[in-house]
A protein has these predicted regions:
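Sec-dependent N-terminal signal peptides of Gram-positive bacterial secreted proteins and lipoproteins
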Residues: 1-25
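Intrinsic disorder/low-complexity segments enriched in polar/small residues
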Residues: 3-6, 83, 97, 151
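N-terminal small/polar-rich segments of proteins
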Residues: 24-124, 160-202
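Generic hydrophobic, helix-prone segments enriched in Leu/Val/Ile
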Residues: 102, 127-129, 152
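A surface/secretory-pathway sequence property marking extracellular, secreted
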Residues: 108-146
């Protein structure tokens, strides 16, 4: 079997070598001293053959929200989340980024562009939360503090190296539910963050 494999590999190598050598279809002679050769090549339409995998959270859970007794101070509920560049191949890190954007599922440019969780049994009960691309929300601004200017969402992070991880925070101010009849707003809430990734120049 080893001998057969060796012969097969040798023949395959010979065929590959032959396919890469130019074919002599014309000759120059003392009576015909000029000739032409067509030079051919192919450029792939794939943009640099870049491939990547950005891993986003499946679920982010605030857990149990508690109605505060007063709203004289903030009552934040924070939960961390991660977005990771699991794989990056072929990216020119000196000139290119993989940019990740995020928006609420119902957000629109020029319209309502904040992030919300909504009561699963009552679509009229929605409460806003904030998205940070840092683990220090007290010393930075939420990405949704400004208006959303692109349909793909707010710019969240730029990746150029495989393995890079962005850890951020979702923040819910429990003052949002202060003053409500708790029996009227009780229940399960959910919302969806829509992520978008694209290769862009730095």
């Amino acid at each position: 079997m080893k001998a057969k494999k060796l012969v097969t590999l040798t023949l395959a190598a010979a065929m590959v070598a032959a396919s890469s050598v130019s074919v002599f279809a014309a000759e120059l002679t003392d009576t015909d001293s000029t000739g032409q050769t067509e030079v051919k090549a192919h450029i792939s339409g794939n943009a640099g053959n870049v491939s990547y995998i950005i891993t986003i959270p499946d679920v982010i859970d605030f857990g149990e929200l508690t109605q505060p007794e007063d709203n004289s101070t903030d009552h934040f509920k924070d939960v961390n989340y991660e977005v990771k560049a699991t794989k990056i191949d072929g990216l020119d890190a000196s000139t290119q980024n993989i940019n990740v954007y995020v928006r609420d599922q119902n957000a629109s440019v020029g319209g309502v562009d904040d992030f919300f969780i909504t009561n699963k049994n009552n679509a009229n009960l929605s409460f806003e939360y904030s998205v940070f691309n840092t683990t220090n929300p007290d010393s930075s601004s939420a990405i949704n503090d400004n208006n959303m200017l692109q349909t793909v969402g707010y710019h969240l992070f730029s990746f150029d190296t495989e393995g890079d991880t962005m850890t951020g925070v979702l923040r819910f101010n429990q003052n949002n539910i202060y003053g409500y009849d708790i029996t009227q707003i009780a229940g399960d809430y959910s919302g969806h963050m829509v992520f978008f990734s694209t290769i862009e120049n730095k």
